[in-house]
């Protein structure tokens, strides 16, 4: 219930009282997921306040690294060259924890349209030692890649057949970009609908 409330608070952008409230949750709440959701909302409500907390959260351990992943999302929401470089460092081998690195790959994807060199990073990540990193790189190539990247996906399929489903979906998305856009939009609408339903339940 509280997590749905924290999510709803992101609608109060630039509200000082909401910002202060969310900061207190981040500082005092003992529940990892509560802190994670509060920070994600703070990034929307008050990105300046979120910036002051992001470094400490990057060093805060939690179950499945949910807090560190939330901190990494800041660099994909507040988009600038400095944050892009930060994501490149976090996504590199040893840049952050094993569980959190894949999130850095996801956030890098938000820069792919404006920074075309990002797709080259995803191609490099196909050779990473961590399967979750390779999987997320495949997904980003499916979203932003071109036909010339299909060979790299085929090579990975031969080396890591466990990722077959992800690779085939990525290749299909590249070959049929109109369907890719439609599927991404449908998924986003479904997620927003679910979150709105949760908020309505709280209100009622």
Regions found by a protein language model. Name each.
Residues 180-204:
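Terminal, low-structured helical/coil segments at or just beyond the last alpha-helical repeat
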Residues 151-152, 175-185:
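Short, charged low-complexity linker/loop segments at the C-terminal edge of domains
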Residues 1-14, 24, 33-47, 66-80, ...:
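Structural detector for internal amphipathic alpha-helices that build alpha-solenoid repeat scaffolds
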Residues 21-29, 53-61, 86-94, 121-129, ...:
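Alpha-solenoid HEAT/Armadillo-like helical repeat scaffolds in large eukaryotic proteins
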Residues 161-162, 166, 199:
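Short amphipathic alpha-helical interaction elements located at domain edges
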């Amino acid at each position: 219930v509280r997590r749905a409330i924290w999510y709803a608070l992101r609608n109060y952008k630039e509200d000082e009282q909401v910002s202060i409230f969310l900061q207190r949750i981040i500082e005092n709440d003992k529940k990892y997921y509560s802190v994670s959701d509060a920070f994600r909302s703070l990034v929307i409500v008050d990105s300046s306040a979120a910036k002051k907390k992001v470094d400490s959260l990057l060093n805060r351990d939690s179950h499945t690294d949910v807090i560190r992943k939330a901190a990494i999302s800041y660099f994909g929401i507040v988009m600038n060259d400095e944050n892009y470089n930060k994501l490149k460092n976090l996504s590199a081998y040893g840049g952050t924890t094993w569980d959190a690195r894949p999130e850095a790959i996801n956030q890098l994807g938000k820069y792919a349209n404006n920074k075309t060199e990002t797709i080259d990073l995803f191609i490099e990540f196909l050779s990473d030692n961590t399967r979750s990193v390779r999987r997320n790189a495949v997904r980003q190539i499916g979203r932003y890649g071109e036909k010339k990247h299909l060979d790299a996906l085929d090579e990975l399929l031969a080396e890591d057949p466990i990722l077959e489903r992800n690779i085939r979906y990525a290749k299909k998305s590249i070959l049929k970009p109109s369907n890719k856009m439609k599927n991404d939009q449908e998924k986003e609408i479904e997620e927003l609908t679910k979150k709105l339903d949760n908020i309505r339940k709280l209100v009622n």
